[in-house]
Design a protein with these regions (language model features):
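Nucleotide-state-sensitive switch-loop elements of NTP-binding domains
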Residues: 1-73, 85-87, 96
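Residue-level signature of catalytic and energy-coupling elements of molecular machines
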Residues: 6, 58, 105, 120, ...
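Structural signal for conserved beta-strand scaffold positions within catalytic alpha/beta enzyme cores
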Residues: 26-28, 78, 135
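Conserved NTP-handling cores and scaffolds of large molecular machines
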Residues: 11, 20, 44-47, 67, ...
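Short acidic active-site motifs
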Residues: 12, 91, 143
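Conserved Rossmann-like nucleotide-binding pocket used by diverse enzymes
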Residues: 3, 103, 134
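Conserved C-terminal guanine-recognition region of P-loop GTPase G domains, centered on the G4
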Residues: 62-131
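Canonical P-loop GTPase G-domain recognition
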Residues: 109-160
């Protein structure tokens, strides 16, 4: 199941729902820059947790506010792409400090954008030396095995 967070729309939830039979529950924050535990708890009312093996919570899409809120998640995951610049960890240190894994996306664009992967990793590890990295490329199917392995490993340590 998936709980999505969005400031004004449920567009992300609608897009996901078109591609899965699993329940996708939208939380619209009406201007707030993050989800909070109460909102997630209310969204869970619509989900049959007994029949759910895995729950993803997609917080509102910024790297500032969501870092400060405990939603009961097993692990915080931060996604950033090569198109955003390797200085993201320096600009948003709290998110990278709180994250257990960073997923670097759009690696297939490296030939076309100025991005130094080693610098990005070094910047992130300055604020979180134990941060795990997964490198992905949707066009080349790169990194998905590592992502799935992380999910299996993390889901095996269920927090009740």
């Amino acid at each position: 199941a998936v709980v999505t967070g969005d400031v004004q729309t449920q567009n992300d939830a609608d897009r996901l729902a078109r591609h899965t039979e699993r329940l996708v529950q939208a939380v619209v924050t009406n201007g707030a820059c993050h989800l909070d535990a109460r909102q997630v708890n209310e969204a869970l009312d619509a989900i049959d947790l007994e029949a759910t093996d895995l729950l993803f919570i997609e917080n509102v899409g910024n790297l500032v506010c969501p870092a400060s809120w405990d939603l009961g998640e097993q692990a915080k995951v931060v996604l950033f792409s090569v198109t955003e610049g390797e200085d993201k960890p320096a600009k948003y240190p709290k998110m990278f400090r709180e994250a257990r894994v960073a997923v670097l996306t759009k690696l297939d664009l490296l030939p076309y954008v100025p991005f130094d992967v080693d610098r990005a990793v070094a910047e992130a590890r300055r604020v979180n030396s134990g941060l795990e990295f997964i490198f992905t490329s949707a066009l080349a199917d790169g990194g998905l095995a590592e992502w799935f392995a992380f999910i299996r490993r993390t889901a095996g340590a269920v927090r009740v």
